[in-house]
UniProtKB/Swiss-Prot annotation:
One of its GO terms (biological process) is alkaloid metabolic process. It comes from the Eukaryota. GO terms for cellular component: cytosol. Keywords: Alkaloid metabolism, Cytoplasm, NADP, Oxidoreductase. PROSITE patterns: ALDOKETO_REDUCTASE_1, ALDOKETO_REDUCTASE_2, ALDOKETO_REDUCTASE_3. The gene is COR1.5. Belongs to the aldo/keto reductase family. Disruption phenotype: Plants silenced for all codeinone reductase proteins accumulate the precursor alkaloid (S)-reticuline at the expense of morphine, codeine, oripavine and thebaine. This is NADPH-dependent codeinone reductase 1-5. The keyword Membrane does not apply. NADPH binds at T27, D51, Q187, S214, L216, S264, R269. It comes from Papaver somniferum (Opium poppy). The keyword Cytoplasm applies. The lineage of its organism: Eukaryota, Viridiplantae, Streptophyta, Embryophyta, Tracheophyta.
Amino acid sequence: MESNGVPMITLSSGIRMPALGMGTVETMEKGTEREKLAFLKAIEVGYRHFDTAAAYQTEECLGEAIAEALQLGLIKSRDELFITSKLWCADAHADLVLPALQNSLRNLKLDYLDLYLIHHPVSLKPGKFVNEIPKDHILPMDYKSVWAAMEECQTLGFTRAIGVCNFSCKKLQELMATANSPPVVNQVEMSPTLHQKNLREYCKANNIMITAHSVLGAVGAAWGTKAVMHSKVLHQIAVARGKSVAQVSMRWVYQQGASLVVKSFNEARMKENLKIFDWELTAEDMEKISEIPQSRTSSAAFLLSPTGPFKTEEEFWDEKD
């Protein structure tokens, strides 16, 4: 366990990752001094894992914060941090993976990433990131060649580990059928309102660590929901344990054997979110949470197309109607 109280998880490749990270998606202060100061404050209070992506447009600001943290002595070396970034869909082509990773490194002002993830199991026509994706730009991903390029990035030392995001059991199976090195992480939505039981069991059987996002319902994000934070069950447990609803939700994810990323620019909540590792939910608590109605918050609508690889949410997530 690190001095900040966050346990270290050993991934199947052997590298160690903090169980809790700070997410950087959907910040309202994108590219501003306030955003940089929030990242600096997170480092100061004890966060050592930061989760970014080319699509988030937060890499440059995070890079500035890391450089300033080193200058201020908040950390002694870059090696104290675990930095994750993601390959955007328009770069999910064999010849574009390495250049995309190198561009992320330039943005972050780093020599290497700790973890590089495929952002979605779909490709787009090459080009700059756009918020509104034309439906005819959505393409099937060639898992074999794209993953081989990811493996090459790791071999070259530009990233210490590689993984995926938003992959179902079926899509993981397809990718691993031709992979030399399996993904070490699958980052997906997971919370008390989306347990992901089947996916968790599949990933555990294949030594893939799940990293949960939207643990608190992603309130404030375009796809967010208040179902987690307004849950009566979680509120009752929180009162009984002397914890917050957020802490109960995060602790539940951790007790399922998953790692997690959460986001807050509020210093008090940053500190509160770190305090989930020195107590446990009881078997009774876990049973109550198991009965919470389930629903997915994140949507793949922007990656669906009548002419693309996935026409419906059910096809994208491999869920039955």
